[in-house]
Amino acid sequence: MIANLKSKLRAMKSSALPGKSEAVRGAGTTARGAGAEGMSNPEQGGNSGKECSPDPESRLDRDRLGGTVASGPDGVFVRKQTIYGYEESYGRIPLYDLQNAVFTDSFWWTRLDRDLCPKDIVFLDTETTGLAGGSGTVAFLVGLGYVGEKGLVVDQYLMRDFDEEVPMLQAVADQLRRHSILVTFNGKSFDWPLLESRMILSGVPPIHWVNAHLDLLPVARRLWGARLPDCTLSTLEKEILSQHRTDDIPGSMIPDIYLDFLKSHAPGKMRQVLQHNEWDIAAMAALLVHFAVLYHDPETDRDACELLGIGKELERAHRIRQAEVCYRKCIGLSPHPFVLHAKKRLAYLTKRYRGPQEAMELWADLAGKEGSSLYFPLIEMAKFLEHQEKDFPGALECTEKAIRLANRFSDSDIGSKRLQAELLHRRQRLMEKMRRRMEQWG
């Protein structure tokens, strides 16, 4: 099926364009905010393709696409390089932090087996012929970002037709091998599996990221999933980075734009596709910087949602004192919808590491709120009063309140039959204990 698709697309191309000499070519490295005089020393990309000698047609296409025709052992492709200087910001995030020390002690929140080192990181984003993946989907544009001497370097690799896929993938693999940590956004489920499968099918030895692939999407969800409508990259740019793109194209349009490009080889909207991909790389770099700053000093004032998310991650990493500080800071921002969750986490944390006596005050506070529909603090209080204090009447009172709440919410999970059965069993046990005590003491 893939071969038929390739043949069909080549036929459409040849009918619209006599030969490959009319294919889009660009030239050079672009530095944001700099003229051509400042571009004489582009960042070196290893063996990621040698530039072909420019010709008049290539120079003509420089302003239309901005790339360079590069050659590899098995053919040619288009390569474009852009540098974001360290003096620049993406949204409200200064990029100089890319080379800063905020990445030390980062393994506990990245969940990798090592700390992040800026020089080891490579950012990856792909643009593909389909959004659903599958055997017929090809990555026609691969963007890679990494830390260079002058700033964030964004290398983009574009295939103008399917016969340029192998040399393009070889160049991409050469650049990837220069780094030891891969950073993507939703790349664990889409970008990298797709690229890896295309490398294998093309005979390019793939790279294996053993516990060295950081997907920023789960990190974002842990911090802001409860506050934002979604955690797409576009939402994070607007709400977190304060970056608003102008003249951007929706990602859903990109496959059709590329198919049109294959037919005509006219640049058209392909320049916007390259810009979209470049912005995605820059956004990932800015997000990583922001994550590192947030987690580098987690006890600094944050908003309630961030404090709750950081506290959970600290708790997971067994950094209990810092987790408690984050939860208490979140609670101090009351009234706020996240305060309840922080109190719940703090109560369980206190019970586990300091004992139930210390947690009683938090449970009593949660259960005593006017209009509270929380049953879990009542159950925890009942457990403590029954098993530790032997206060059976007090435990029974808490259990009765929990039963009334469960009956009120019988149509929801909070009033499930299992919960009601457990509460009724607890009540029966407490009443039996009280009866035996009365018989014993008369």
Q: Predicted regions span which residues?
A:
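Conserved RNase H-like, two-metal-ion catalytic cores of nucleic-acid enzymes
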Residues: 109-181
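Conserved DEDDh/DEDDy metal-dependent 3′-5′ exonuclease domain
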Residues: 149-239
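Structural register within alpha-helical repeat arrays
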Residues: 310, 345-346, 381, 395, ...
